């Protein structure tokens, strides 16, 4: 790159040693080597970009030539294909319009069905609320012993649910009461 021979390199090292001294010479060599690496990297990057641009330009030129040759030779075939595609698109558009017209009447019928289903749901809800009112009246007529039986059943159910989540505490681990602790001290 610089046409420097071995003897010239030795001469530069001796001159650098005299000018910079033994402490600064290694630092200066590292700095110069970093500059050389950076310059080489930039040069390689520029060369790669130029090669890519040239390839891209060649491809664009060849594509333009191929298009001009193919369009002249294939124009009757392309026009037939374009006409066929337009005919198919018009046919599909007509089918979609027919389906849309049919769907419009179907939507109206569906709205009527939904309204009737909502009315039936209201009627069944009213019937359920009447049954619930009858059950509450029958609960009000129950005797206190029936209510007590229900309460004990509910307590047992609650205890089983709680014991599944929280295991029962050990009685032996419980702290001693004040009277027991005073007896042990005396």
Curated annotation (Swiss-Prot):
What does the subunit comment say? The Tat system comprises two distinct complexes: a TatABC complex, containing multiple copies of TatA, TatB and TatC subunits, and a separate TatA complex, containing only TatA subunits. Substrates initially bind to the TatABC complex, which probably triggers association of the separate TatA complex to form the active translocon.
Give the encoding gene's name.
tatB
The UniProt keyword set, sorted, is: Cell inner membrane, Cell membrane, Membrane, Protein transport, Translocation, Transmembrane, Transmembrane helix, Transport
**Region span, Disordered:** 120-186
Q: What does this protein do?
A: Part of the twin-arginine translocation (Tat) system that transports large folded proteins containing a characteristic twin-arginine motif in their signal peptide across membranes. Together with TatC, TatB is part of a receptor directly interacting with Tat signal peptides. TatB may form an oligomeric binding site that transiently accommodates folded Tat precursor proteins before their translocation.
Cellular location(s): Cell inner membrane
The UniProt similarity line reads: Belongs to the TatB family.
> Where in the sequence does UniProt note compositional bias of the Polar residues kind?
177-186
Gene Ontology BP term (one): protein transport by the Tat complex
Asked if the keyword Cell inner membrane belongs to this entry, the reply reads: yes
Record's signal peptide = none
Q: What is this protein called?
A: Sec-independent protein translocase protein TatB
Which HAMAP family does UniProt cross-reference here? TatB (MF_00237)
What topology in the membrane does the UniProt record assign?
Single-pass membrane protein
Q: Principal place where this protein is found?
A: membrane
Looking at the record's lineage, which domain of life comes first? Bacteria
Q: Where are the transmembrane segments?
A: 1-21
């Amino acid at each position: 790159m610089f046409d420097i021979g071995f003897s010239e390199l030795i001469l530069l090292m001796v001159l650098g040693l005299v000018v910079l001294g033994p402490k600064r010479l290694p630092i200066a060599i590292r700095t110069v080597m970093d500059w050389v690496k950076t310059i080489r990297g930039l040069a390689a990057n520029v060369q790669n970009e130029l090669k890519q641009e040239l390839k891209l330009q060649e491809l664009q030129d060849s594509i333009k030539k191929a298009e001009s040759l193919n369009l002249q030779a294939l124009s009757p075939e392309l026009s037939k294909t374009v006409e066929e595609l337009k005919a198919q698109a018009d046919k599909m558009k007509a089918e979609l319009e027919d389906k849309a017209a049919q769907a419009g009447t179907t939507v109206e019928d569906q709205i009527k069905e939904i309204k009737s289903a909502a009315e039936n749901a209201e009627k069944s809800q009213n019937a359920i609320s009447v049954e619930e009112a009858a059950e509450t009246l029958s609960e009000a007529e129950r005797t206190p012993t029936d209510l007590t039986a229900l309460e004990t059943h509910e307590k047992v159910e609650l205890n089983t649910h709680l014991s599944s989540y929280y295991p029962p505490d050990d009685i032996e681990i419980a702290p001693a009461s004040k009277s027991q602790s005073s007896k042990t001290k005396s």
